[in-house]
Amino acid sequence: MGNRLNGSYLSNTDMSIEDEQNKYNEAIEDCKICNKVYIKQSGKIDKKELNRIKKLDFFYSQKTDYEIERMFFNVPNGTFLLTDDATNENLFIAQKDLENGSLNIAKLEFKGKALYIDGKDYFSLENYLKTFEDFYKYPLIYNKNE
């Protein structure tokens, strides 16, 4: 069985353990690890928390605190994709807890072909999405025309 890093397949006998570790480190450096944001929701989101969320650069500055809260509270429970526009340039996976309504949000950033989330290599977005059953997709832009 070969090693799959950056799309290359080499037999285990062709690489020393040190070479394998170096190749793995290079693969990780070629990718950005996505950041997880944990938002506890009981009633209203704290103003400090809203300010922190706005600094994550996936909310448009014209989005009001109310619009951010409404987006979080009105989505169904389960797992869904968040995008900031129709081009899907910024993708986020969000998982809403069935019991307390809290959200786990992971920003998906790609460099090269690999996708690393919490240190685990999924190789592609499609492989990551296969780990969930139900998906919903929401834009992060508030469109007044709709």
From Swiss-Prot:
* Superkingdom field: Viruses
Q: What induces it?
A: Expressed in the early phase of the viral replicative cycle.
Q: Which UniProt keywords apply?
A: Early protein
The role this protein plays is: Plays a role in virus cell tropism, and may be required for efficient virus replication in macrophages.
Q: Which family does it belong to?
A: Belongs to the asfivirus MGF 100 family.
What name appears for this protein in its UniProt entry?
A: Protein MGF 100-3L
- Organism of this sequence: African swine fever virus (isolate Tick/South Africa/Pretoriuskop Pr4/1996)
